[in-house]
Amino acid sequence: MTAPIALALDAPDLDTACRWANAVDGVFSHVKVGLETYLRDGALGVAEIRAAAPHCALFLDLKLHDIPNTMVGAARSVADLQPDLLTVHAAAGHAGIAAVAEALPQTKVAAVTVLTSLSAV
């Protein structure tokens, strides 16, 4: 049985992220790929992370925030990764959040209301 824990793969490089993901495969429920890792390693990197942890769900923490049309386009661009969970920023509003949820019906959409650290902004 896996623990309902998500490991944040905020690693310095893809190799380290894959090693960390593999280490928790079957133990933790999710691996979390954030914006920095996604932009650095791209969809192919995320696919490598998924392959390293095939028993973990993919939590894609991109915090999408734009007009609804653009959010849908961004969500569709990651659809091939089959994220189990995708984050959007709550400030995008109901229309944006609902549009992403409709565009990716197999993905849970979580709205982030406050960033972890506002002091660094």
Residues of each region from the PLM?
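Conserved anion-binding
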Residues: T2, D66-V121
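Hydrophobic faces of well-ordered beta-strands that scaffold small-molecule active sites
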Residues: A3-L9, V31-V33, L58-L62, L86-V88, ...
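Short beta->alpha connector loops
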Residues: A11-L14, T37-L39, A91-H94
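Short, acidic/polar
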Residues: P12-A23, P68-S77
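Short, well-ordered alpha-helical microsegments
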Residues: A17, G42, V46, G93-I97
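Surface-exposed amphipathic alpha-helices with a cationic face
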Residues: D25, V46-A53, I97, A101-P105
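Metabolite-binding pocket within alpha/beta catalytic cores that recognizes anionic/polar moieties
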Residues: K32-L85
